[in-house]
Amino acid sequence: MQHFFYKLILSYDGTFYCGYQKQPQKKTVQQTFEKALKKMTHQNIPTFAASRTDKGVHSQGQTLHFQTTFSLKPKHFQKTLNYLLPPDIRVRQMHFATPNFHARYSAKSKIYQYVFSKKPLNAFNHHFQIFADKFDFVKITKALKFIEGTHNFFAFTSETQPKNFSKTIFQASLKETVHKYILVFHGNGFLKYMIRFLVGSLIEIGKNKFSLEQFQAMLLGNKTKKATLLAPAKALVLKKIFY
C-alpha cells in the first residue's frame, strides 16, 4: 500500500491549550489537530512537530510532518483541515514531503520572539504581550549581546538531568516598533523554558534588580546560580523553523 508524506506549517493561539504536545485528559494543539486529521481521513495518524511549545505559547511557524495512505493534493488537504480545525489553529502551508524528512530532527535552527507592549495591555493584545513597565532597554540590549554565541545554558532551564546544555544562539536582538519592543532569539535549539528564563533575567536587568556581570557569569555555565524569574508564556511566539 502506498504511503504519502506531508509537511505543513501550523499557526496557533496557544492561550486556551495546555501546550502543543498531547497529554492525557488535557486539551492540546496536537490532540486537537490529530482529531481533525482523523475526522478527515478516518485513520489514526501520528504527527511529529519541530517544537513542543509550552502552555500559553503561540506559533506562526510550527512545522509538522506525518504519513498516511490517504491521498489528496496538499492545497485541498489544507483547505479541509482548516475547515475542521477551530479558528485558533490554522494550517498556513502544506506540501508533499520526502520520506526522510523529520520536522524535529531535520531542523537546523529556530526563531522565537518575545513581545512587550509599550502601553498598558488592552482587550486586543493581553493574550499576546506583556507590558514593558519602566524597563531599561539600553541595559537589556547590552545583555542580549552576551547571549549570542555558544554557551552552557544550564542556569536557564528547568532540566537537571545530565545532558548537553550547550546551545548556539546566532541572534539575540531587540526590535522596536511604534507600539512594541520585540526580543528576537535565533538559535540551533532551545532547552525547556530556556527563552522564558532568559527573558525573565532580562526583565530583572531592565528593572535594575540584576547586574550585567551576574548575567554574564551565568552564561559561563556556573551551576551555583539558576535563573529564578520565568517570564509569562503568553508573549512568546515560535516564528520560524529553518531546514
From Swiss-Prot:
Q: Keywords in UniProt for this one?
A: Isomerase, tRNA processing
Gene Ontology molecular functions? RNA binding; tRNA pseudouridine(38-40) synthase activity
Q: Which GO terms describe its biological process?
A: tRNA pseudouridine synthesis
Residues holding substrate: 112
Q: What is its EC number?
A: 5.4.99.12
Q: Where is the active site?
A: 54
Q: How does it assemble?
A: Homodimer.
**HAMAP family from the entry?**
TruA (MF_00171)
Stated name of the protein:
tRNA pseudouridine synthase A
According to its UniProt entry, this protein's organism is: Aster yellows witches'-broom phytoplasma (strain AYWB)
